[in-house]
């Protein structure tokens, strides 16, 4: 692996992981709210 590849991909992977984490957390909250309404 070339260090320049890591320099370019590192921030992109961090941003993608952070976005995915936030999307998953929001989706879980929505699902929990849905089940709470159904109960």
Curated annotation (Swiss-Prot):
Record-linked InterPro entries: PSII_PsbY (IPR009388)
Keyword Thylakoid (UniProt): yes
Keywords recorded for this protein, A-Z: Membrane, Photosynthesis, Photosystem II, Thylakoid, Transmembrane, Transmembrane helix
Chief site of localization: membrane
Membrane topology listed for this record: Single-pass membrane protein
GO terms (BP aspect): photosynthesis
UniProt GO MF annotations: manganese ion binding
Gene Ontology cellular component terms for the protein in this record: photosystem II; plasma membrane-derived thylakoid membrane
Transmembrane as UniProt keyword: yes
Sequence intervals crossing the membrane: 5-23
Described purpose of this protein according to its UniProt entry: Loosely associated component of the core of photosystem II (PSII), it is not always seen in crystals. PSII is a light-driven water plastoquinone oxidoreductase, using light energy to abstract electrons from H(2)O, generating a proton gradient subsequently used for ATP formation.
Subunit: PSII is composed of 1 copy each of membrane proteins PsbA, PsbB, PsbC, PsbD, PsbE, PsbF, PsbH, PsbI, PsbJ, PsbK, PsbL, PsbM, PsbT, PsbX, PsbY, PsbZ, Psb30/Ycf12, peripheral proteins PsbO, CyanoQ (PsbQ), PsbU, PsbV and a large number of cofactors. It forms dimeric complexes.
Alphabetical list of HAMAP family matching this protein: PSII_PsbY
Family named by the database record: Belongs to the PsbY family.
UniProt-recorded name of the protein: Photosystem II reaction center protein Y
Organism: Crocosphaera subtropica (strain ATCC 51142 / BH68)
